[in-house]
Regions:
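An N-terminal assembly and electron-transfer interface module characteristic of large anaerobic redox
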Residues: 1-442
């Protein structure tokens, strides 16, 4: 169903595919779209994802068929074949992915035929369909990962008992994805596991090729990546464990204990790791408690994020900072089945907030203004202050309108430079504490 989107917080499906390729080692995208399509998307992703920049032969450097009027009239298959051939000649990549856009889908180019013409055993080529009418960037994330992991990589003859894959964190559209993945990997390695994150600096294309050897897929999202891990289980026989991204000590300890129900982890080691990490976490946290208590920094709060961050952020604010988390806005364009999955996950996590699904920035602003009444001459009234908003760079103006403070954490995140920052796990929880209270100190 169509919906009105004002100041969007996502792109089309092609944008999601571009963001994945931007972060995935050894893979290059060949963009079969109209002139300017890939460049515009790359600029939006690069700037909106914490100014993450472009990868090698990704983003603004990616090969493109640059379809124009001639190809629209006579077809663009020959132009695509030419572009793939040239890309194979000059780019040293392990895998080439041809991604389509709206124009080339509408004129009906036979992309599969073009791919078959140029197949090279040393440089394989696959294709995906990513026009805007297939979904937004999060759908593009699922489309490209499904193609690579469930249609391209080989089936493993034998599983590695301690190897796990991480899915659900969406590169770029979760702007803190690298830091989040690093922290999850660090914790799991402390438990004796081997971890494929696919998108961190230590990963190579071999991690992609060997993903089918994993004994378990860990899905850190209530909605995104579900298609990927379900198809992965059918194709490769690998079960999955689905949960939300853990932020802070309480959520992370719970996550690790639940994980131990799905893969063999030594119970004594598990409790030792949780204890040492928790002790370190609160030893550092308590150093900030004097400043927090003396300044009376206890807030009404709201979050405006995607599905991946909505629940863990709200729970962290409520249970670890002791704030009154009133409104949780989720800005994804969710189909009914994903809406139900999100609502179910939200209802299972009690932090006293109201869940609102809305893609419209202006409507979100109006809602927050309505719930924070201005003084109309009364002697007493509840103005619900002080107020803190965790959202995107778009939401700073809304926070200012209601007399609050904002920390941008979600896409589009153009007002911060993100390299290794992440909020997942124990260390990520402390990083979030630092960022929140540094914003107040500033």
């Amino acid at each position: 169903m169509a919906c009105y989107v004002e100041r969007p917080r996502t792109t089309c499906a092609l944008g999601g595919a571009i963001a994945v390729i931007n972060a995935l080692p050894g893979v290059t995208l060949v963009n079969h779209t109209a002139i300017g399509c890939g460049g515009n998307l790359s600029g939006a992703i690069s700037g909106g994802a914490g100014n993450m920049g472009d990868g090698v032969f990704a983003g603004s450097h990616m090969p493109s068929s640059a379809v124009g009027e001639k190809e629209v009239v006579f077809g663009g298959a020959d132009r695509l074949t030419e572009e793939i051939t040239n890309a194979l000649d000059v780019i040293d990549a392990e895998l080439f992915v041809v991604a389509t856009g709206c124009m080339t889908e509408m004129i009906g180019d036979d992309v599969e035929a073009a791919v078959r013409k140029v197949q090279n055993p040393r440089k394989p080529v696959i294709s995906i369909s990513t026009p805007s009418f297939k979904g937004d960037a999060y759908a593009g994330y699922e489309i490209i990962l499904d193609a690579i992991f469930n249609k391209f990589i080989p089936k493993a003859e034998k599983k590695e008992e301690k190897l796990v894959n991480i899915f659900g964190i969406v590169p770029g559209f979760d702007p803190l994805f690298r830091g989040d993945l690093r922290e999850i990997k660090r914790l799991l390695e402390r438990l004796g596991l081997k971890v494929n994150t696919f998108f961190t600096a230590d990963q190579t294309f071999d991690n992609v090729l060997n993903a089918s050897k994993a004994s378990l897929n860990i899905l850190l999202s209530p909605v995104w990546g579900t298609t990927v891990v379900k198809n992965f289980e059918e194709v490769h026989g690998t079960p999955y464990f689905q949960t939300t991204l853990p932020i802070g000590a309480l959520q992370t300890a719970r996550f690790l204990r639940k994980l131990s129900e799905h893969i063999d982890i030594d119970p004594a080691l598990l409790e030792e790791v949780i204890k040492t990490e928790t002790d370190e976490y609160y030893e550092d946290f308590i150093r900030a408690s004097d400043t927090i208590a003396n300044r009376q920094w206890f807030f009404y709060s709201a979050t405006v994020t995607n599905s991946n961050y909505a629940i863990p952020l709200g729970e962290f604010l409520y249970k670890e900072l002791g704030w009154h988390q009133e409104d949780t806005f989720v800005t994804d364009q969710l189909k009914p089945i994903k809406k139900r999955a999100l609502v179910k996950a939200f209802d299972e996590t009690d932090f006293g907030s109201k869940l609102t699904l809305d893609t419209d920035t202006q409507r979100i602003s109006r809602t927050l203004n309505k719930t924070r009444p201005r003084n109309q001459g009364q002697r007493y009234w509840d103005n619900k202050t002080p107020f803190f908003l965790l959202g995107s760079s778009l939401d700073r103006a809304t926070a200012a309108e209601v007399g609050g403070v904002a920390l941008p954490v979600s896409f589009p995140l153009s007002s911060r430079l993100i390299t290794t920052r992440g909020y997942a796990g124990f260390r990520g929880g402390l990083a979030l504490v630092e960022d929140i209270y540094s914003t107040l100190l500033g």
